[in-house]
Amino acid sequence: MEKITLAPISRVEGEINLPGSKSLSNRALLLAALAKGTTKVTNLLDSDDIRHMLNALKALGVNYSLSEDKTVCTVEGVGGAFNWKNGLALFLGNAGTAMRPLTAALCLKGATEAEVVLTGEPRMKERPIKHLVDALRQAGASVQYLENEGYPPVAIRNSGLKGGKVQIDGSISSQFLTALLMAAPLAEGDMEIEIIGELVSKPYIDITLAMMKDFGVKVENRNYQTFVVKGNQSYLSPEKYLVEGDASSASYFLAAGAIKGKVKVTGIGKNSIQGDRLFANVLEAMGAKITWGDDFIQAEQGKLKGVDMDMNHIPDAAMTIATAALFAEGETVIRNIYNWRVKETDRLTAMATELRKVGATVEEGEDFIRIQPLPLTQFQHAEIATYNDHRMAMCFSLIALSDTPVTILDPKCTAKTFPTYFTEFEKLSERT
């Protein structure tokens, strides 16, 4: 297996321009494909998850052209539901941001009835989709499980979404609600979506609503309990759509600056629609110096102290706090993060296991993790397993900010969101 060893870093300093956000890139491509008119999507992320969405759209008859560096995509919208030849199968890798929204969009009524199968890597078949399918069936959709009940692969008929009152469980993933919301305006009738349980990762719903508005559709949001969407609408191309830099990817560089130097990330700023920008507030609460601009966030080293916080609103960026916690004074507790367990891997168990390898004392709860800090000289050189999870690889690069090297297995798994991550991290790193 491939591996990379990072030697101890004495200081990090510099500026990094972030690649486009994964969540925004795949939403933008799907909305552009469903819309009337042509949309030029810029600062698109070039990564595995985006490639899976692009391949699926092509198979569904969507015409687009991609720039040579794959960061600009001009999409010709189909102006409504997709049409395809019966018997199509789409392979979506481990891309939740493609699997969930497409599951809903492909239920919409096509010109001629056809079936499509959505499948993916073995891990995708372990990632739940039941809450979304239950909701779609209430709206009149035809979705069948092909292997295990509640999980992909699924077979979908484009027999239409009638609308009406629909209940959806919000407690596992916000992607289910995002998928339903994005399909709802193209349903045959109005849809009233009621949330059951606590809605997790609310800021990701804000992203979805903001982007739907950019494509001409307004949703009535009644305090995140009920969402009302008029049916029989069309998405309208905004002609150009700029994808913000990935706020989750920013977290590694900002944390590095907070631990050992000064780093400025560009491509997101104080007006970003991504909830993960609030990661910078957590670093500030820990003692880092944070500066906000319209198009940048800067983090500068401060005396870090542990925090005890609910991080349900920033689930992806919260992982970075788990490794940064080793460099703080006092323990850190990250709470209300059960949905770490249904991501690319079970991130709670993975994080606890790998932190212990470098010498940390960690308590793993059902929906929390408690981490004791580690003196710089007491880190142990370990080989970090990454579980085919891009964020595990990136989080553990921070261990090199101690006095000990770190070896990361399968570093190329960062291709899911940030293929050049280790090159960029290296550019900011100084060694004595």
Curated annotation (Swiss-Prot):
CDD domains, A to Z: EPSP_synthase
Transmembrane region(s): none
UniProt: phosphoenolpyruvate binding residues: K22, G96, R127, Q175, R347, R391, K416
Pfam family, one: EPSP_synthase
EC number: 2.5.1.19
One term under GO cellular component: cytoplasm
Residue numbers binding 3-phosphoshikimate: K22, S23, R27, S173, S174, Q175, S201, D316, N339, K343
GO molecular function: 3-phosphoshikimate 1-carboxyvinyltransferase activity
Family the entry assigns: Belongs to the EPSP synthase family.
Subunit structure as annotated in this protein's UniProt entry: Monomer.
UniProt-recorded name of the protein: 3-phosphoshikimate 1-carboxyvinyltransferase
Organism: Actinobacillus pleuropneumoniae serotype 3 (strain JL03)
Gene field: aroA
